[in-house]
Structure formats: structure tokens, C-alpha cells
């Protein structure tokens, strides 16, 4: 079963259609560029409005910054510090929608088109970005791809013992179907420009998939905050010293919390955690040498665990005498509860580690920050490491 999602926007005197085709096993994005005489007239007003907005933006001293996810947004706000009043900062995923299911609107694309700084993760879920950037009105825009910034620190998805893989039969069917049409390969032509993003395309070339959840490492966060600071210093040189000072101070806070995590793990007798859920915390556990077991990989769309997966994880809880079974935020806890019910003691705590994939703008207004979530996660993690 597939869904076709179509939206149009005006750019360079033409009406463009972005067609997003989503299958169960993955996402495929196709850009169809047509000059539609029948609908151009209907979009003339929109085109004029866009042009006016772009012109107005040049006369507006406020920086225009667009981020996709909450961690990026919060990092930007910390680097801006008391200069935040001089910037309009947008978080596209502001209603708690998961990165993996996000569908950009025409308004989102237009906002990106004229911004000064655009920040996105750069994984498989962001395949729509490449086409969006091709339509950018502001050719001086600075773009930060988190996964590109981290380079070799980016990790491949891994399927470990006991973890349930994707439905192979369904995947094979969709894979074959996706290659039935020549137009599905139009995106190959889009790779000519010199700002290709390696991590975005590796999984197409060799079927390697990279773990997108890079923000869940405090070490990665330090690197990325520095990149954001350097970008802001280029865009707004008059406030460069302030941005550097703010970034240095914030990075100091990230380092301090990183040390707290390390100390907690070093002092723990148990260094294994188990998730009755998908597992987006690969970067975090690797930072501190923790072992993990989980029902699904981090980007899995699976929601029902097999009998074999439940049995394996239940036995692992018994074998290691694990006191906690984890889930991630906003998820059904039935798998974790079923694992516990199949253990010998049936008394494990079901706790949540927050992967920051459902943070909304209202949460931000209520004081949620990247550091506050990571501090809370540390408190919860300590429960499991006793």
C-alpha cells in the first residue's frame, strides 16, 4: 500500500511539484519539474507574495534561521544567547511529529528557500531536503548537515542478537516495485552539484543505512554547537564574539554533563540496558561503553515484536538480572510489559528514556531544553545501572 503526497510551490518563474511517495519499507522522493500553463495563473499571486517576502527579508535585519528538529533549535538559541531577539528561529517539527514521519509543507519549503541558515540531520528521513535546497532563493544561505559535520563519527545501523529486523518479504516487494519506473531514478541527476551529502546517499549505493540519532551523544553535541557558532559568526560578523562566547559556555555545560554520564557508568556494577522498543540511543551507549539489547533498530517502523524477540529479551533480563526495561517517549509500553511478564520475577521497572523526537513548541515554551532532557535521561539511566 502506498500514499502519494503532492504539494506545489512557486520558484524561478515556474510552478514546481514535489511528489512524495511513501512505502512501508522506506521513503522515495521524486521531483517532477513542469511548467503548468493551466495553473501558473493561479500561482501568480503566490509568486508575487513570495518575491515580496524575499525582498522584505533582505531589508529585515533579523537573521532567518530554520531548523528541523528540537536539539538543533535549542542549540541555536543557546549560541544566540541575548542576541536571540535579532533572529527569527523556526523549528519545523514543532508539533511533536517524529522525524521519521515528517512531511514538509509548501510553507516549510518556502521558509527554507529564503533563510540565512538551515540546519538538518541529513539522514534517510531528510531525503526531501536536497530538492528543497535546489529551489533556494537565497544562494548565500549556509547549510549545516549534522551527519556531514560529524563525518566518521556517524555510525551504521546495526542489527544485534535478539533484535527483530524489518519484514524482508515486504521490503523485497517494495524494493522491486520502486524500480519498475525509469522516472524513479531522476534523482541520480541531482548528484552533480558539489554539496552532495555523503551520508544521505550511502544507503542508496550500498544499501548501508546510517543511524540518524546523532544528537543523543553529548560528545556529538559539542562538535555540532561549534559548527553552529561558526556559521552564525560568518552570517553576522558584528556579533561574532558574542556567539563564540555563548558557544564556549554552552559547550562547557555539555562537557560537564558528559562527565557526569561517564562517572555514573564507571561506578555502575551493571553496564547493560535493554529496550522493549526501537533503539535510537546507539550513540549514547557507545560513548560510555554500555552494552544494549533491543526489540528493533532505531529507525524501525515495526510495532509488533515476534515471539522469538520477546522470548530472547525475557531470557536476557533473567540472565543478567536487569532491574529495568526501557521504552522511548510517547510509545506503547506493551512490548516492554510483555517482556517483563515473561521473566521469572516479573518485577522489572518500565522506564522511559527521552530521544527528543516528540518535543513540541509548547514543550519549549514550558522550559524544556536539550540539557534538561539529557539530565533527566541520566537520572533514569542510573536506575538501570544499579
Protein language model features and the residues they cover:
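Extracytoplasmic metal-acquisition and chelation regions
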Residues: 37-38, 51-386
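Gram-positive cell-envelope targeting signals
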Residues: 1-62
Amino acid at each position: 500500500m502506498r500514499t502519494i503526497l503532492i504539494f506545489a510551490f512557486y520558484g524561478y518563474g515556474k510552478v514546481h511539484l514535489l511528489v512524495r511517495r511513501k512505502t512501508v519499507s522506506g521513503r522515495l522522493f521524486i521531483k517532477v519539474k513542469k511548467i503548468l500553463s493551466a495553473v501558473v495563473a493561479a500561482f501568480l499571486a503566490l509568486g508575487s507574495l513570495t518575491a515580496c517576502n524575499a525582498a522584505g527579508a533582505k531589508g529585515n535585519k533579523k537573521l532567518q534561521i530554520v531548523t528541523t528538529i528540537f536539539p538543533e533549535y535549542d542549540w541555536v538559541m543557546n549560541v544566540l544567547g541575548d542576541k536571540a531577539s535579532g533572529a527569527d528561529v523556526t523549528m519545523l517539527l514543532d508539533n511533536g511529529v517524529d522525524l521519521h514521519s515528517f512531511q514538509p509543507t509548501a510553507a516549510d519549503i518556502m521558509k527554507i528557500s529564503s533563510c540565512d541558515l538551515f540546519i538538518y540531520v541529513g539522514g534517510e528521513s531528510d531525503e526531501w531536503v536536497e530538492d528543497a535546497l535546489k529551489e533556494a532563493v537565497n544562494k548565500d544561505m549556509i547549510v549545516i548537515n549534522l551527519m556531514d559535520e560529524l563525518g566518521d563519527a556517524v555510525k551504521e545501523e546495526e542489527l544485534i542478537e535478539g533484535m527483530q529486523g524489518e519484514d524482508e518479504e515486504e521490503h523485497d516487494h517494495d524494493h522491486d516495485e520502486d524500480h519498475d519506473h525509469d522516472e524513479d531514478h531522476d534523482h541520480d541527476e541531482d548528484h552533480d552539484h558539489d554539496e552532495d551529502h555523503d551520508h544521505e546517499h550511502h544507503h542508496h549505493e550500498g544499501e548501508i543505512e546510517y543511524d540518524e540519532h546523532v544528537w543523543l551523544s553529548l560528545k556529538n553535541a559539542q562538535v555540532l554547537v561549534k559548527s553552529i557558532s561558526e556559521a552564525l559568526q560568518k552570517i553576522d560578523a558584528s556579533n561574532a564574539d558574542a556567539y563564540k562566547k555563548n558557544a564556549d559556555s554552552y559547550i562547557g555545560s555539555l562537557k560537564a554533563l558528559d562527565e557526569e554520564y561517564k562517572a555514573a557508568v564507571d561506578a555502575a556494577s551493571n553496564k547493560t540496558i535493554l529496550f522493549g522498543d526501537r533503539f535510537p540511543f546507539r550513540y549514547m551507549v557507545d560513548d560510555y561503553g554500555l552494552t544494549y539489547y533491543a526489540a528493533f533498530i532505531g529507525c524501525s517502523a515495526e510495532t509488533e515484536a515476534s515471539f522469538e524477540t520477546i522470548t530472547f529479551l525475557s531470557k536476557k533480563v533473567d540472565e543478567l538480572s536487569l532491574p529495568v526495561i526501557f521504552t522511548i517517549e510517547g510509545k506503547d509500553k506493551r512490548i516492554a510489559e510483555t517482556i517483563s511478564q515473561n521473566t521469572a520475577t516479573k518485577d522489572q521497572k518500565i522506564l522511559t528514556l527521552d530521544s527528543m523526537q516528540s518535543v513540541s513548541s509548547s514543550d519549549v515554551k514550558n522550559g524544556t531544553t536539550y540539557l534538561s532532557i539529557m539530565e533527566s535521561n541520566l537520572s533514569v539511566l542510573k536506575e538501570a545501572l544499579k
